[in-house]
Each structure stands twice: as structure tokens, then as C-alpha cells.
Amino acid sequence: MKTSEKDLRINKGVIRGKEIEIIVDGESVKAFEGESVAAALFANGQRISRSTTKENSLRGMYCGIGMCFECVMTIDNIPNTRTCQTFVREGMFIETQQAEGKWKTV
Amino acid sequence: MKNNEVIIIGGGVIGCAVAYYVAKKGINVMLIDQPKRGRATSASAGGLWPLGESIGLGCGVIFHKAMIEKGLLPADSHIPPQLPKSFLDFAIQSNEMFPSLTGAIKELSGIDFEYEETSLLFLMYDDADVAFAKTLYGNCPCGNSRIDWLTPFEVKHSEPAITHNILGALRFNGDNQVNPYALADGYREAARKLGATIITHTEVTGIKINAGRVSGVETKAGFFPSKYVVNAAGAWAAQVGEMAGVEIPVYPVRGQIIGTEAMPKILSACISTNDCYIAQKHHGEIIIGSTTEETGFNTDITPSAINSLCKGAVRAIPFLEKAKVKRVWSGLRPGTADELPILGKVKGVEGYINACGHFRTGILNSPLTGLLISEMINEDQLSFPIEPFLLSEERLQSLTNNENSNHKTSIQ
Amino acid sequence: MKNRKPIVIIGAGPAGMGAAIEAARAGASCILIDEGRFPGGQVYRKNSKEFQVKEKEMLTAEQKRGKKLHEELEEVSDKIKILTSTSVLGVWKNREVMWSSNDASGVIEAEQIIIATGAYERPVPFPGWTLPGVMTVGGVKSFIKTMFIKPGETALIAGTGPLLISTANKLHDIGVNVLAVLEAGSPSWASPDFINQWGDADFAHDIAADLLELKQNNIPILFNHTVFKINGKDEAESVTYGALNPENWKPLEDTTKTVNADLVALGFGFVPNTELTELAECKHEFYPGIGWTVIRDEWMQTSQQGIFAVGDGARISGAIIAEEEGRIAGIKAAQNCEAIQAVDAEKRSEKYFSRIHSFEKFRKHLNEVTSVKSGLLELATHKTLVCRCEEVRLSDVDKAITEGAGDLQSVKLLTRLGMGACQGKNCSPSMGMYLCEKLNKTAYQVGRINPRPPVKPVTLGALANMTITKDSHQNDSYDAINTGGYYEK
């Protein structure tokens, strides 16, 4: 499991859900049930969710309330999934999205 | 200020095409436009389907099925009415202009309107579809040289994303697509480069007529004199005609349309089924259309239409189930009861010219329409016989009294 | 009571919860819909149920209010159909509500609709505002509150309004180094007189407490200052900030300083989320510096019969007033359904009206001090992205204006501004203001970017699987929707 040099979780006063593994860009990452995908990634120090179509510039979570679509990533082969509104599951397959993202079409 | 010889009212694809072809003749031309919600160009899928449209595919077949379901047509009438040969010839000639147009527009305006040679596939789901396809295959007005009958295996091979639950498909070669907005923008910018004056966001309030002759156009931004006025006002053509005292039997016909998020290339052909048509555009989004509804100038969208278009799309391409809908919107087609455009001069008002009533085929028929209007103004020999499309007194009478019009019934 | 269609309440924040509580108490059939996993909205958002959170001994006033509201809703939850993880895609003026949840969608015909969709942070474009590490203050606050994760190590907070202060304190609490709060105005709420003047309003106490805490936390607050530019290659690394002209908030370019920060929290006030009231063709009005609000009568009824708008989604007033507005609408909607008599409705709503009236002056005052001034628009350069989704630069908008575009809709057609996934929420408020300034036009002339259904993401599969419920008492297609289990007993 990829162990980030930092874990930004606050542990005082809270007991998280079950520890699980998610796959982020091919690497195993620690997450806890009840966390949003964005939260699990932030905790692991990853704030970049995607690069844009036109200018290939990097974006990350901005509004945090599901409204801005900046935090979208490809989750379980479905691009443009809002990571702030999607909750982690054991084995969830998450990819940093480039432009429109890759679909598994057939 | 230079004197305008020609003023075009309407900045949709037809108005812009006319501006381009007239400017190309070196004639001083001005286009006046007030963008309106519901303009047909902005709700088009950009299909160039001369064969498909002429024999009732695209929206025609969807509408036809809905009529049968509502009990308005007998269940065994699996053949949508075909349009006259003159329309097919017009559409084919116009379609043939696109390959050279694409270079010309790009050179002048820098705009690529994304002309793509896709072909059109009609999917056969059941025996009724096969019977319909057989009729088309056997009786196509241009012979079946442009039509291929594909087996399910052949469809699977060329379009793997299409459902395997089909009995076959007809491929219409030469039925292609463009980006409709880019086409209109391209014509407009090319016209501007050729010296046309483009006035946008300006409402036309009247057409001035002196002694039976057009003398100019009144707008909210003042009066502009001109010798010719071209009515290219789409669904609003009747209102513009009225300003010149000309009765134009054009009425708005709503089409609702769905656009998906951008997807990787999953379709190389445009698809027509009896539920919907589907076209993937250059940016990757997939356009799914369309309803045919007579609801006045109402541009609402309706849940039942969204539902049936989505069902149709998922049936044809199961993978689309996971795709997200980005937007649903609607446009108002300039409908005519005989489904033919209204072109050319009218009796009684010198200098007034129609370029309206293009219904479902404005994108496809824009180049030839533009060319013909420019030839008419320049008094050149016409590249196509215009007679079937003139608003003669007989045609006007039949259009205004036409009880047979399909579209007088609202179907959702 | 006749077999009636339900009251549909859209949004389960303070306003929607208030509405649902009162409608249910009055005996009306009602459905409460929210996109989140649980009711609560942004301000009273609950933790994931997978988390066990030790309740603090000393709750803040806001936490107390939230707790009470959740308890009240729970008491009547068996009388309400609560559809969580459910999006509303569109509302029609004939009172149809289109929803989706996972792989299904449907249309509910409602007797009454109460729209309580809340607000979002007003976007102010400037160089670098799209970099990862730049977030809204509301987003930061709710992220910390529900996820217990540090969004960065060193933070700078900028914008206007009291939410900046509470966010700064919250970040400090969890060990983030908060460099400063940059307040664009010099608002009266930050002065010591404020509590003396408005002491009877709950919210004034909250602000005073937050300010005191900020002082104890040693976090400086700079008035008439804001962020000019955020620098960084892949993510936010440093921030260039400076002073604003107090009159018009124009940036004073020779005052800039640069500090290192990896988290920038922005909050320039709020914009009501009026997509659904727009789709339902309710009438709206515009207040300079504040924005578009929904026109309502004293019972919170919009110009469309049977459609209410409450809380920050109608007009920004904060959570306390939102709740009262929701309650009033819930009571009136129940009366419109003939669940209660007019006299009863009057009686039930009396105290909520009186609370609202007592807040009225305070609200007007707060509107004045949280509005933005147009000088902020000068922070954007030609190259600044003004539409984040479609990557439209300010220069593209300028070009469209040169070509004759005189309103937002025309700019949209020429540039794709507002055509992206957020449907113009992150560009329309700032560019509307920009067009007004540049063309010397009113907000009504400049217009808005028309929302189009679906206003939330939904798959074709879900729309193909649509149930149109004519009589809501039969075959409730939404029975299968997960209610999140939050109030399950």
C-alpha cells in the first residue's frame, strides 16, 4: 500500500469507519468507509483531480458541495464523476482524469 | 456608408448562407439578426441526410411511429410519406456542395465546420422495420446504388457499439454530417471577409415598400435602405413576411434534443431508428433527437420526450446507459405543410425574396439555397430549377388549406 | 381530507427541514428530497454515519440550532417520505418535479412545491483561482466538519462576510497555520459597536464570538484587502495580495505582497441557487451588489401558483431566517392542501413571522455589508479564465462584446461561456456584473444564462428508466430510493 509521507486526517474526537483500500492511478491507497473520494485523496496529499480539455490545466476540488464539477475523476471506468459527492468503497478504481477521460465502450 | 443592395433578415444557417453566396458575387449585402431562443440552427444535430430525409428517416420515421401509436395512422402503414423527386434532387445537389464548401469557408473565415463523411444507418429492430427497409431498398428514387443492406454481422463489425439485437441495417452512403453552429458561424465570418455587413442583436420592425417595390428595412437601430430584402427568418418567417404584406405559411415545429457529455469516438456513422436519431459530433458529445411537435413558439422541454429519446438511444447503443446527459433543449423548425422550402420572389412585391420554410433540412439545403438566391439577385442562370419551391398562388392555397399536413397534430 | 398529491420539498437544509417539519405536523402528505446522504444541507450537515464523533461538551450556537432542527425532523420522520441521495433535475410550472437516484428517474406531480435549494459562493475570477488548493470557504468548512481532514497546511482566507472568520477559526482548530483573513470591505459587523446595536439577533452573537476567537487565535484580519493572484505550477503555492480602494474595491496595484500558502479559501458572499425557480418560470428581481432573488409574498409563495421558494435559495439571509421561512411555507402549503384551516395556519405561523420581522432590519443591514463592489472585477486580466468549465477567458468575452453581444445569452452563444457542467453558476454572476459595467446596462438588460434541465448530472440509463407518477398514492416509484437510513428506527 502506498504510504504517503503525510496523512492529513484529524483523529482527535473521531473514530472513522472501517479501513479499506482504494486504487488510485494504479496504486493502493488507504481510505475509511464514510469518506468521500475527494476526502480520501486529500488525506493522502492528492488534491489534483483532473486536467482540462482545452488547455490541459490542472484542477481540484473547489466548491466541495457538488456544484462546480472541478473535482470530477474517472471512477470505476465512468468519467466525470464528482469525487466530493461519491463515497469510497473497497476496491474502488479511481483515475486522475485527462480531458474527457477514458471510457470502456464495448 | 455604402449602399446595400441586399438586406437579409435572419442570422440562422440560411441567412448566413445567403449572405455568403451574395457577398461572393461582389454584391453589397447586410445581414440583420436578432438571436432568438429556439432558433432551429442551434437545436440541429447537423445531419446532412439527403436520402434519409427524402424518404422519411431522421425525424420522419420517429414521427410516423408516434402517429401509429396514437392511432392516427393505420398500424400497417410502415412507410412514412416520401417527399417529391424535386426535393431529393435539390438535397442531393446541395449535399454535393459541402466538400468544396468546407475548404472555401475555412480559407476565408478560419472556421472548420467539421464536415464528416459518416453515412447514415437505419437500424431494423423487427419485421416491420425490415418490411420498411425492403420498400426503401427496392424503391429508392435514386436507385439503390447509394444504399447497402447490412447483415447484423456487418453492423457489428463496423459499429461495435450498436446493439446486437437487430435484424440488419440500411446504410445510406453520402449522408453525412457537419457541426451546425460552426457552419452558420463559418458562412457568417466568410461573408464578413467578403465585405458583408453583419448587424447582430438588432430587431427588425418593418419592411419599407414604395410603389410595390422594397426600399429598405426599419430596425430598432434605424432605417437601412436596400433594393432587395431576403426573408430568412426561420420559424419567424411569417411575421417578417407580414411586414412586406406577404403571407408566408411557415409555422414553428418544436424539436427536443439531448446532448451527452463528451465521449470517446464510439460511432462512425449517424444512426436513425424509429425511436430517435443519434449522431456523435466532433467534440465527442452525442446528439439524440428529436420530437416533432406543433406547440407554437413554446420552447419548453418535457419529461416524456426526454424519456422516450433516452430509451431509444439506450436501445440502439446499450453502452450509452452509463453516459450522462449534459443538456436537453429544443428548437423551432420552420415548418411547412408540404415539407418543402419556400424560395424565391413573390408576385406583387418587387425585391422581396423568400429563403424560408426549410423545416428539418436547413443545414443540408443551406448551400444550394444561398447559391440560388445569389443567382436570382445577380440575374444569373439558376443552378437548379426553382419552380417547385416558389410560393405560387396555387401552392399558397394548398399550404394554407392543407388538411393533410402531418404536423397539425401535436405529438410528444 | 381528500386524497391529495403530495407537497414536494426540494432541499433538506434548514429551510427545507423547517418546511417539512411544519407540513408534516399539519398532517399534509409530504416528500423531502435532497442530493446528500442525509438531511442537514451545508450548514447543519451531518457526519457520515460510518463515523463515530464524540460530541463536544460546549456546542456552538449554530451546532445547537442544528441539533434541535434534526431532532424535530426526526420526531415527524415517519410522516415524511425522505428521499436522500436523490437529485431534482427539473421543475415545471405545472408542478411536475423530475428526480433521479442512481439508475432510476421519475416525475412526481406535486400539489405544492417548496424550493429550498440554498446558495453557493459568488465567484470572483482572478489569476490563479482555478489552481488546486483554492477552495470556497463554505466548501472548506463543511469538508472539515464532515470529513475531519486538513485541506492544507498553510492557509490564507479572502473574500467578504462573517463566514471568513468562522472558517479561519475552524482551520486553526485543526492545526492549519492560518496566515490572515483578508476582508475586502471594512464592514460594521467587525466593529465593537456591532454587538451593542444588534445584540438581540442570534447571528450577531455568533459573529461577536467568532471575532473574539479569531483574536485569541492571533489571526490578523486585514480590511480592504484581498487576493490579487494565486501562484503555483500544479497547485497553489503562494498568494499575492494587496489593498483595495475602500470606495469601489478597485485593486491598488502598488500595494502587493506575496506569501507562501498552499490553501486559499475564498468567499465573496453567496448567490441564491435559483435554477429551479427559473425553470418553473417564477419571477425574479435584482439587487445591485447582491444579485438575483426570487419574488415572494409574505407566505413565501412565488409568482407561480403552488410554488414556494424559501431560504438562501430565494434570497440570502442565513440559516436562522431560512428555517423560519421554511416553516411558514410548510404551514401555508399544508393549508393550500386543505390539511389545516386558514385560522390555524395564522396561529401556527405567528411566532415565525414575528421572528422574521425582528430580523428584518438586521437582514437589510447584513445585505448591505455583505454585498460586493464592482471594482473586484478588475482583478481579472485578459487571460484570466472567467468560465472554469469551458475555459473561456475574459478576452473571449471582450471579443464577443466587440462583435455585438449585449447580454449573457449572446455571449454564451459566441464563446460557450456557461455551457459547461456547472450551467453557468461559476461565471454568470461575475460576467453579468461585468457586462453591466462595461456596457452601462441594467442586470435586466444583460439577463441571465438560462438553466436547462437536467440541472444535476444524470445518466441516459436513469432517464430511460423513468416513472411518471400520476397518482402518487399508487406505485410510488421512489419507494425503492434509499433514505440514507438516517432516521430509521
Region spans (language model):
Chain B
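Active-site substrate-recognition segment that forms the wall
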Residues: A17-K24, Q34, S44-E53, G60-P80, ...
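Dinucleotide-binding Rossmann-like beta1-alpha1 core, especially the glycine-rich loop
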Residues: G47-E154, A313-V314
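C-terminal catalytic lobe of FAD-dependent flavoproteins
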Residues: I317-Q412
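Short beta-strand to alpha-helix junction loop
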Residues: D89-I92, F122-F132, L170-E189, D300-A305, ...
